[in-house]
Amino acid sequence: MMMDPDSAKMQDYSGWSFGFHMPPTSSTNLLPQSMPDDLSNGPDSPDSTGKDGKKNDDRVKRPMNAFMVWSRGQRKKMALENPKMHNSEISKRLGTEWKMLSEQEKRPFIDEAKRLRAIHMKEHPDYKYRPRRKTKSINKKNGAPIPFGNLDTKTPSYPTLTTNWNATNQYIDQFRFAPYPTTTVMDQIPFSLTYPVHSVPTDNSSPSQFQPSPMSTNFAGSYLTPKSESSPVGSDSTVGTVDSSQFRAYYDHTKDQMMYPYSIELTHAQNIQNALSQSHVTS
């Protein structure tokens, strides 16, 4: 029978005494150690047990009261009748039954508790009741543990965001922009101030009748050359030069917003020239 050479090598290696043996780990060679008694239940616990399984005698038990004397036999009876009932439920029912008993029914158990207390005081004259410290239970919310119980678990309140676009615009306009004029404010503004009207000259009107309005910035009709009042439409006399006085009366470059920067520079230049000419004359 033919064998694969690799499998043959593996078989040879497995036969060696030192081949493929894992060293013992820390968990395999550790011997089981018993937990110290002081870490398991503690000396103050009445249910703490020693190495031999016996209860620790260093802890002096508290003497039983009348209810404990009565419930000692009733607990066993109820546990036998209800084997699946939890111990806390048994204690709750026993407490309810104890409250329903009369003083005559409780009297023998009260006397027995007094007798046990007297014996306890004789055996342990320096006894002092030391209740066990209860560990603070961690606050839980919705089943999830909270690491710090003193933290405020209230939900922080945030301002609700509105989806109304008009309300958002009012909030923005309050800090950045002036409010838009309403229709009542717009109605009070004259129509000539909001929409300047320019009248185009006709053949039967004089150029002096068409002065630009003070608020007018539109100069589309300002450069139209007026025609002669006496010349008919389409005659040859319409072509010619226009008197400069009529043109100045019709068009004033100082009122033109586009020409205003140039007119200021021209005025400064004329003033400088006049000042220079006067200085030459005086000299």
Curated annotation (Swiss-Prot):
Protein role:
Probable transcription factor that regulates the lineage progression of embryonic blast cells and controls the postmitotic specification and differentiation of neurons. Cooperates with additional factors to direct the differentiation of the olfactory neurons, functioning with the transcription factor ceh-36 to specify AWC neurons and with the LIM homeodomain factor lim-4 to suppress AWC terminal differentiation and promote AWB neuron differentiation. Plays a role in the terminal differentiation of glutamatergic and cholinergic neurons.
Task: Give the subcellular location.
Answer: Nucleus
Q: Where is the composition biased (Polar residues)?
A: 217-239
What are the UniProt keywords, alphabetically? Differentiation, DNA-binding, Nucleus, Transcription, Transcription regulation
Q: Which InterPro entries match?
A: HMG_box_dom, HMG_box_dom_sf, SRY-related_HMG-box_TF-like
Phenotype upon knockout?
Answer: Animals arrest at the first larval stage of development with an unattached pharynx. Able to form neurons, but with defective terminal differentiation of both AWC and AWB olfactory neurons, OLL and IL1 sensory glutamatergic neurons and cholinergic neurons including IL2, URA and URB. RNAi-mediated knockdown results in failed transdifferentiation of the Y rectal epithelial cell to the PDA motor neuron.
> What is the source species?
Caenorhabditis elegans
The record lists the lineage as: Eukaryota, Metazoa, Ecdysozoa, Nematoda, Chromadorea
Where does the UniProt entry say this protein principally localizes? Answer: nucleus
For molecular function, the Gene Ontology terms on record are: DNA-binding transcription activator activity, RNA polymerase II-specific; RNA polymerase II cis-regulatory region sequence-specific DNA binding; RNA polymerase II transcription regulatory region sequence-specific DNA binding
The protein's matches in Pfam families, at most eight in alphabetical order, are given as:
HMG_box
Gene Ontology cellular-component terms for this entry are: nucleus
Which cysteines bridge via disulfide bonds? none
Tissues in which the UniProt entry reports expression:
Expressed in AWC and AWB olfactory neurons throughout life. Also expressed in the IL1, IL2, URA, URB and OLL sensory neurons, the AIM, AIN, AVK, RIH interneurons, and the motor neuron class RME.
Q: What is this protein called?
A: Transcription factor sox-2
Q: Which GO terms describe its biological process?
A: brain development; IRE1-mediated unfolded protein response; negative regulation of transcription by RNA polymerase II; neuron differentiation; neuron fate specification; positive regulation of transcription by RNA polymerase II
**Mind telling me which SUPFAM superfamilies this protein's record contains?**
HMG-box (SSF47095)
Q: Which residue intervals are annotated with compositional bias (Low complexity) in the record?
A: 205-216
Q: Which residues bind DNA?
A: 60-128
Q: Where is the composition biased (Basic and acidic residues)?
A: 49-61
Q: How does it assemble?
A: Interacts with egl-27 and ceh-6. Interacts with ceh-36 and lim-4. Interacts with wdr-5.1.
Note down the stretches annotated as region Disordered.
24-63, 202-239
